[in-house]
């Protein structure tokens, strides 16, 4: 009962203060403007979180492709200089993967570098980049087979490793791809908003 009375008194106090304050129309406009701006900002923040979550899951509807907000094609960012490819190390869920995870196979590092360059090219298609990456990895196994002759255990292990690395990139590579595309591209409407 005391709690109910407390809420009632609080409500009366708030209603009384609102009735006493008679803001001028100018103040009211700025208050409603502020409210609309805050509301818009909140929706944009929620949308940004949803987009980030979708990137972690592999993109919207399972499609990982960078698009501008109003359906226009992204354009290369003027003056953008891509980062140096960093081999097979990267960030996973925002945490730097240690260099020790890089297997240090020069041919594999070459494949990873090609993937980095592809991701950093504005307008690239993630699935084409990934397909080239898979082909590069499996070409290592083919070269190994030619060098060592027919050794089924080595060939099977190599193919298995190549498929594992490829599937990891295919499944978890949407976020790095989208981050690279955001850095390499600009959308016409973004340029207007920044002015």
Swiss-Prot record:
Q: Which residues form the signal peptide?
A: 1-19
- Is the keyword Plastid in the record? no
Instruction: Give the highest taxon in the source lineage.
Output: Eukaryota
Q: InterPro entries this protein is in? A: PLA2G12, PLipase_A2_dom_sf
Question: What GO terms fall under cellular component here?
Answer: extracellular region
Cofactor: how bound: Binds 1 Ca(2+) ion per subunit.
Is-annotated flag, keyword Signal? yes
Q: Which residues bind Ca(2+)?
A: 89, 91, 93, 116
Query: In the record, what terms sit under GO molecular function?
Result: calcium ion binding; phospholipase A2 activity
Its function?
Not known; does not seem to have catalytic activity.
Q: Identify its protein family.
A: Belongs to the phospholipase A2 family.
Name of the protein in question: Group XIIB secretory phospholipase A2-like protein
Give the species this sequence originates from.
Mus musculus (Mouse)
Q: Lineage from the top down?
A: Eukaryota, Metazoa, Chordata, Craniata, Vertebrata
